[in-house]
Amino acid sequence: MEEQQIQAYGKINLSLDVKRKRLDGYHDVCMVMQTVKLHDRIFLTREKTPGIRLSSNLDFLPTGEDNLMVKAAKLLAEEFSIKEGLSFRLEKRIPVSGGMAGGSTDAAAVLHLMNQVYALGLSIKDLEKRGVKLGADVPFCLHRGCYLSEGIGEILTPLPNLPACILLLAKPAFSLSTKAVYEALNVSAIPKEEHPDVEKFLYFLKKGDLSEITPLMGNILEKVSIAMRPEIQVLKERLLSYGADVALMSGSGPTVFALFPLEHKARAEKAYQALRYGEDRHLAQQVYLTEPWAEEGGIDE
């Protein structure tokens, strides 16, 4: 049968605060997430032979039942009694275990794609309810744009997009476990003044002036991740040395994004060349130049 495809976009955290650890082991968060144009591609072929199969361009990526894409497909296949075979092919570009919701956005894309291909009639809210069963970031990844994310990540409020700018994404050669980072976070011991001021950030985000927004970006997980891997701090400082307005870790890391205003495109390109091919290539294994996604709505809606 004809192959269907969809794009799955990555995200960065413009502001990330953790309020408390819950009794169920999750954490209540207050964070601002922005879709970026860096994306994976997912292809689906319907087959006569039953079963869910996944292949990837990355040999080290697990493709069995623990993969979130497989879990997402299985969730809808079981609920809607889809008996035919599903063969997924993943072209992965978003860093794996990099703090950019790469696994969550692929799962969200599978939900969207199956909803379209099988005409399931699920609304975005219906998909969110199913997505949160797969992971806290999946509901956000069903959308594109900028959102305030609260609760464990499932309470979403749309926001204005980050103003147009250039984003340099750099992931070191190592990965960090989100679970390990959160387990090492002692949120009750962090003074109030060290928490990102998300409310103030939102005020200036709505005004839309980058020069007022960037000083208020923050990530409460940075200190924890940097304590585990000091190389993240080295990478941040190097990106700032190229003239970035801000260099901040995304999510639990270790990917760092550097933000450059459009008028400083040459600085961004110089940093990219140095990290990708030049004297700083030891600092990052994957380096991309991208920009904020500037259109609201679900994936390929």
Language-model regions: role of each:
Residues 1-98, 116-128, 162, 171-174:
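ATP-binding N-lobe of GHMP and related small-molecule kinases
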Residues 5, 41, 146-148, 167-169, ...:
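Conserved hydrophobic/aromatic beta-strand scaffold that supports enzyme active sites
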Residues 14, 42-44, 69, 103, ...:
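Residue-level signal for inorganic ion chemistry
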Residues 34-35, 132-133, 139-142, 158-163, ...:
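Solvent-exposed alpha-helices and their adjacent loops that cap or buttress functional pockets
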Residues 85, 107, 111-148:
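Contiguous, small/hydrophobic- and glycine-enriched helical/loop subdomains that border
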Residues 89-118, 136, 245-257:
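Glycine/serine-rich anion-binding loops at beta->alpha junctions
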Residues 123-134, 217, 267-276:
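Short, well-structured alpha-helical segments that form the helix of a local strand-helix-strand
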Residues 143, 147-246, 263, 270-273, ...:
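Conserved, helical-rich catalytic subdomain that frames metal- and/or nucleotide-binding sites
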